[in-house]
C-alpha cells in the first residue's frame, strides 16, 4: 500500500470515528448522564513549570492544547503538499484555490445576511466557511470506485486551501488583546526553530522542546494557541521521503485520527435537544450556520468547480460530470470539527449562551449536506 492509499484509508477511519464520537456526545448530552458529561469537561487541570502555572478546564485543554497538535499535523501536510504533493504543480493550484475561496465567500455571505443586525451574532460569520477533511473523505470513501480518484485528490486540495483560509481567519479575526512580551518570546522561539532547521538539527525532541515553549508563549500572547502548531510545522526540515517532516507526520497522524479528533468531537458536539423548539431552529445563528454549510458551500463550490469542468474541460480525461461535481460540492458542506472549533473562538468572550445554537447549526447543516451529497453521488456516479 502506497502513502496515498494509506492516507485515504486513515482519513476514512477518522471520519467513521468522528461520526461515532459525535453521536455518543449527542446521546450523552440528552441522557441522564448529561450533568456528568458537563462536569467532566469543566474539571480543571494544571501544569506548572517553576513559577509559571497554566490552569484550564478539560474542554479548553482539548481545544487549546490537543488541537494545536492537530494544527501541527495540518501544517506538516500543507508543507509536504507544497513541496512535493498536490500543491507542488503550480499550474494546478488555481482550480482548488478559487473553488475553496468561492466555498468560503458564499457561506459567509449567507451568515451575514441572517445576522447583519446583531453585532455579537455577526462574530460567528466564519463558522460555516469550514470543511472537515476527515468527515468528507470518510463519506466519499463509502462510495468506493463510484467517485473517481482524481475527484478525491481535488477534494483533498480544496480542503487544504480551506484549512489555510481557516488559519488566516483565526489569526486575523479571532485574536484577543495582545501581550507584547509574550509575542516577543514567541518570536524568539520561532527564530530558534528556524535556526535549528538552518543548522541542520534533525532531532525531533529538540524541535518539540522549543515548540512547547512557543505554544506557551502564544497561549499567553492573546493569539490563539493552535496557531503555534502551524508555525512549528513550517520550521520542520523536509528533505525527501524519509525527512523529519515525514517521520513526524507519520507519527502524529494516528494520534490525531484515533484520539485527538474523536476526543474533540465528543467534547464539543454534545448538543442537547431538551427544550428544543421551533424558535431555536429559526434563530439567526442557527439559520446562518445551517444554511451557510448546506446552501452556501454547495453554491460556491459547484458554481466555481462546475465552471472549470464544463467550460475549461478540467478533469475531462477522468470523465467527471457535473452531477459528481454537485455531489462533491454538497459534501464540502460538512464543516463539523473546524466549524465547531471556530464557533468556540467566535463567542467565547462575548456570549457563551450562543454555543448551543452553534452546535445545532453545525450538526444539522453538516448532517444534511453530508447525507444529500452521499445520495447524489450514489445515484449519479457510474460504478467503475
Swiss-Prot record:
GO cellular component: a single term: plasma membrane
Keywords, sorted A to Z: Antiport, Cell inner membrane, Cell membrane, Ion transport, Membrane, Sodium, Sodium transport, Transmembrane, Transmembrane helix, Transport
Cystine connections: none
Segments traversing the membrane: 7-27, 58-78, 94-114, 124-144, 153-173, 179-199, 204-224, 256-276, 285-305, 325-345, 357-377
Reactions catalysed: Na(+)(in) + 2 H(+)(out) = Na(+)(out) + 2 H(+)(in)
UniProt keyword Coiled coil, yes or no: no
Membrane topology category: Multi-pass membrane protein
UniProt subcellular location: Cell inner membrane
One Gene Ontology term of the molecular function aspect: sodium:proton antiporter activity
Role this protein plays: Na(+)/H(+) antiporter that extrudes sodium in exchange for external protons.
The name this protein goes by in its record: Na(+)/H(+) antiporter NhaA
Phylogenetic lineage: Bacteria, Pseudomonadati, Pseudomonadota, Gammaproteobacteria, Legionellales
